[in-house]
Regions:
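Hydrophobic anchor residue at the start of the ABC signature
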Residues: 138
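Conserved ABC ATPase "signature" region
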Residues: 95, 99, 105-120
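Conserved ABC transporter NBD signature motif
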Residues: 56-71
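ABC ATPase "signature
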Residues: 208-209
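Catalytic Walker B motif of ABC-type/P-loop ATPase nucleotide-binding domains
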Residues: 149-153
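Helix-to-loop junction immediately C-terminal to a conserved catalytic motif
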Residues: 48
Length: 233
């Protein structure tokens, strides 16, 4: 089973997502790259059921997100760690997520240790740095022990030590058999962890293949600029 997007289209004033198709299989990290405004976040929102595509399908293990019987056990996500309600403590936020998703709250202390936030368990979210909120967002994404992760710019706000920690954790999660879709503008980090890469520019997929295929063009950075649509150059 896998995440499969087929012919996904969406249109807004001045922007069009056109026939986006790619797959994320279990046990692999797929880097999702593109310039600002290229359609990355819109694609992820459609995948997670936050928007409906005008055409095409976005399926997780054969079903759209809205029809998953246990969504948080199937896919975890980070879209924007800054939105997390600031009035709650770290533990209260994860407890709320667990109750909402019908999940076991006993995993919360273990996850806080895993993301190195146990020391901040009683701290209000409003007092967390962006990097700490990213760690909290990851704990929330892992709360249901999901088979897939969808991560949108999860490295924002992390210091160099935090980025290295996150890189190692992603590899561990992949080696446990999880499929991971990683959207990031930090090309060096995508290059360090991705098995495959999907590039999107001006609303359409401009390249898709193994990391080694793209690096054969010189480097992932070279390939990124080579695959930009004329509008984004």
């Amino acid at each position: 089973m896998s995440i499969v997007l087929t012919g996904v289209c969406q249109a807004y004033s001045g922007f069009e997502l056109r026939d986006v198709s790619f797959e994320v299989s279990a046990g692999e990290i797929v880097g999702f790259l593109g310039p600002n405004g290229s359609g990355k976040s819109t694609t992820l929102r459609i995948l997670l059921g936050l928007e409906r595509p005008a055409r095409g399908t976005a399926l997780i293990e054969g079903a759209p997100y809205a029809r998953l019987s246990e969504p948080m056990r199937t896919v975890g996500s980070i879209l924007d760690a800054q939105w997390i309600a600031g009035g709650q403590t770290v533990t209260q936020y994860l407890t709320w997520l667990a109750i909402a998703g019908g999940l076991d709250r006993s995993r919360i202390p273990v996850l806080l240790e895993q993301v190195d936030l146990a020391y901040a368990a009683k701290r209000r979210v409003s007092r967390l740095s962006l990097g700490m909120r990213q760690r909290l967002g990851l704990a929330g994404a892992l709360l249901g022990d999901p088979r897939y992760l969808v991560l949108d710019e999860p490295l924002n706000g992390l210091d160099p030590e935090g980025i290295r920690w996150f890189r190692d954790l992603l590899r561990q999660l992949r080696d446990q058999g999880r499929g991971i879709l990683l959207s990031s503008h930090i090309l060096s980090e995508v290059s360090a962890v991705a098995d495959r890469v999907v590039m999107i520019s001006d609303g359409r997929v401009t390249g898709s293949g193994s990391l080694s295929d793209f690096e054969a063009e010189g480097s992932l950075e070279d390939a990124f600029f080579k695959h930009l649509a004329p509008k984004d150059r």
